[in-house]
Design a protein with these regions (language model features):
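Short coil-to-beta-strand
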Residues: 12-22
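Conserved small/polar residues in nucleotide/adenosyl-binding loops
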Residues: 1-5
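Conserved nucleotide-binding/hydrolysis micro-motifs of P-loop NTPases
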Residues: 19-21, 66-71, 117-120
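Short beta-strand segments at enzyme active-site cores
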Residues: 16, 61-65, 111-112
């Protein structure tokens, strides 16, 4: 289902990532690292502004907050080849941008869950805990 179609359904739609993250975290990070030229970055932000008028914000944004050591541990456990070269510096920059963005998020309801002591992939009890937190917010 595409983002546009999610506005017309009565069912809950779960997305792994929002358009906000691209505009407020990944694009500025690439620009700051010199991997996205300023002109492209400005064009991207202009496109993002246009999209904001077309896409309804989520009814509930769930932010899974994590420390860098926990992120590194999860990445190693997953064992994905394309994630093996992610540097601590890159993760730290993204984490800082996520924290700044989420602190100022005002487009809808926000559920912030610190997952440093939760393993919802391997531990059913942790999974149920997170589900209950989400159900309370919906």
């Amino acid at each position: 289902m595409c983002i546009r179609d999610s506005d017309s359904t009565k069912e809950n739609v779960i997305q792994d990532r929002t358009i906000y993250e691209d505009a407020f975290i990944f694009a500025p990070n690439l620009n700051a690292m010199g991997l996205m030229p300023q002109r492209d970055y400005e064009n991207y932000l202009s496109l993002f502004d246009t999209m904001l008028n077309l896409v309804k914000p989520p009814d509930l944004l769930i932010y899974l907050q994590s420390s860098i050591p926990n992120l590194v541990n999860k990445i190693h456990k997953r064992g994905r080849d394309y994630e093996k070269t992610i540097s601590i510096e890159y993760l730290s920059r993204l984490n800082e941008r996520y924290e700044a963005w989420i602190t100022n998020y005002d487009s809808g309801k926000l559920l912030k869950i610190n997952v440093d002591d939760l393993d919802f992939v391997e531990n059913k009890s942790d999974y149920k805990t997170i589900l209950e937190l989400i159900k309370k917010e919906l």
